C-alpha cells in the first residue's frame, strides 16, 4: 500500500510538469472560394493558392518543432481554379495555454493567407462572382 501511495504521489507530481502536460491535437484549416474553369474564370482567387500562402506564413509564425503539416490538398479537377483547399496540422505545445497560442497563430496565418490571395487577385470583401462571394475565406477547426 505504501509503495502504491508513493507511485501515485509521483505520478500526480509529474503530471504537472511540461513533459507530462503536453497538448497535442490536430487542426484543420479549410479555405473556400468561387473556383471555376481556368479559361472562363482566369484571374479568380484560388483556395489552394491561399492554402499555400498560409503554409509559408506558418513557417514564420510557429516555433520549429511545434507543428507538423500532415495534409495539404485542394481542387477537384484538371484545368480548374481550386474552390477549396485544406491544410491539416498536428500542433504540440507544453501546456494548454501554449497550445491555444499556437491555434491563435494558425488562425491569424490562415486569415492573412486568404487576404494575401484576395489582394493579389484584386478582390475585395463584398465582391461577387455569379452571385457568390468572390473572396477566399478560411475556417480553422480542432480535431
Q: Which residues does each predicted region cover?
A:
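Sec-dependent N-terminal signal peptides
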Residues: 4-13
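C-terminal segment of classical bacterial N-terminal signal peptides
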Residues: 14-19
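Midchain, well-structured core segments that form catalytic/ion-binding scaffolds
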Residues: 22-143
Amino acid at each position: 500500500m505504501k509503495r502504491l501511495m508513493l507511485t501515485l504521489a509521483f505520478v500526480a507530481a509529474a503530471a504537472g510538469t511540461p513533459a507530462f502536460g503536453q497538448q497535442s491535437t490536430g487542426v484543420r484549416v479549410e479555405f473556400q472560394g468561387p473556383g471555376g474553369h481556368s479559361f472562363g474564370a482566369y484571374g479568380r482567387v484560388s483556395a489552394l493558392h491561399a492554402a499555400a500562402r498560409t503554409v509559408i506564413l506558418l513557417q514564420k509564425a510557429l516555433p520549429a518543432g511545434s507543428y507538423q503539416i500532415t495534409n495539404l490538398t485542394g481542387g477537384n479537377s484538371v484545368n480548374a481554379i481550386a474552390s477549396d483547399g485544406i491544410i491539416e496540422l498536428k500542433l504540440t505545445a507544453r501546456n494548454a495555454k501554449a497550445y491555444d497560442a499556437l491555434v491563435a497563430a494558425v488562425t491569424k496565418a490562415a486569415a492573412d493567407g486568404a487576404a494575401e490571395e484576395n489582394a493579389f487577385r484584386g478582390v475585395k470583401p463584398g465582391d461577387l462572382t455569379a452571385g457568390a462571394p468572390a473572396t477566399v475565406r478560411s475556417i480553422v477547426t480542432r480535431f
